[in-house]
Amino acid sequence: MASFAQAAKSLLLKEFVGAFFLSMRQFFAPKATLNYPHEKGPVSPRFRGEHALRRYPNGEERCIACKLCEAICPAQAITIEAGPRRNDGTRRTVRYDIDMVKCIYCGFCQEACPVDAIVEGPNFEFATETREELYYDKDKLLANGDRWEREIARNIAMDAPYR
């Protein structure tokens, strides 16, 4: 009896017909791909992309040179040199470098920062041709912050209830 069922299946090509209809159903289903350079998919507010240093609304940089991000970085990709204390008792950085080749995009630096100075922004398109371009200095980080400030502020505001 089992051999009869086996012969009937092979004679009627049950597996072939089932696979054919499955293929046809997928062929006519709506496409799930994007035309990437021209269309970009949605990015989560918690997305960890290119690093940026933020400024206060008055234009002053937020980083207070506490060096918590440098201490917590597991890849040791951040280097900070603090300047002398100012008249009001605060400090600012003289040098703030991130080696993006070493960075593992864990987000610990962003979590450790008490003033939300260092953030990982929404930009994921920062490929370079040389390794030297992946060594970000303070000017490059501040420029990233200025360029992406609106999106960064929106993402931080959306994520605020969960912090």
UniProtKB/Swiss-Prot annotation:
EC number: 7.1.1.-
Name of the protein in question: NADH-quinone oxidoreductase subunit I
UniProt catalytic activity: a quinone + NADH + 5 H(+)(in) = a quinol + NAD(+) + 4 H(+)(out)
Free-text comment on the cofactor: Binds 2 [4Fe-4S] clusters per subunit.
Gene expressing this chain: nuoI
MF annotations from Gene Ontology: 4 iron, 4 sulfur cluster binding; iron ion binding; NADH:ubiquinone reductase (non-electrogenic) activity; quinone binding
Its membrane topology: Peripheral membrane protein
UniProt binding sites for [4Fe-4S] cluster 2: C73, C103, C106, C109
Matches recorded under InterPro entries: 4Fe4S_Fe-S-bd, 4Fe4S_Fe_S_CS, NADH_quinone_OxRdtase_chainI
Compartments in which it is found: Cell inner membrane
Biological function: NDH-1 shuttles electrons from NADH, via FMN and iron-sulfur (Fe-S) centers, to quinones in the respiratory chain. The immediate electron acceptor for the enzyme in this species is believed to be ubiquinone. Couples the redox reaction to proton translocation (for every two electrons transferred, four hydrogen ions are translocated across the cytoplasmic membrane), and thus conserves the redox energy in a proton gradient.
Domain 4Fe-4S ferredoxin-type as annotated: residue spans: 53-83, 94-123
Family annotation (PROSITE patterns): 4FE4S_FER_1, 4FE4S_FER_2
One annotated Gene Ontology cellular component of this protein: plasma membrane
Cofactor(s) needed: [4Fe-4S] cluster
Family classification: Belongs to the complex I 23 kDa subunit family.
GO biological process, one term: aerobic respiration
Record PANTHER family: NADH DEHYDROGENASE [UBIQUINONE] IRON-SULFUR PROTEIN 8, MITOCHONDRIAL (PTHR10849:SF20), NADH DEHYDROGENASE UBIQUINONE IRON-SULFUR PROTEIN 8, MITOCHONDRIAL (PTHR10849)
Main location: membrane
Binding site for [4Fe-4S] cluster 1: C63, C66, C69, C113
Keywords: 4Fe-4S, Cell inner membrane, Cell membrane, Iron, Iron-sulfur, Membrane, Metal-binding, NAD, Quinone, Repeat, Translocase, Ubiquinone
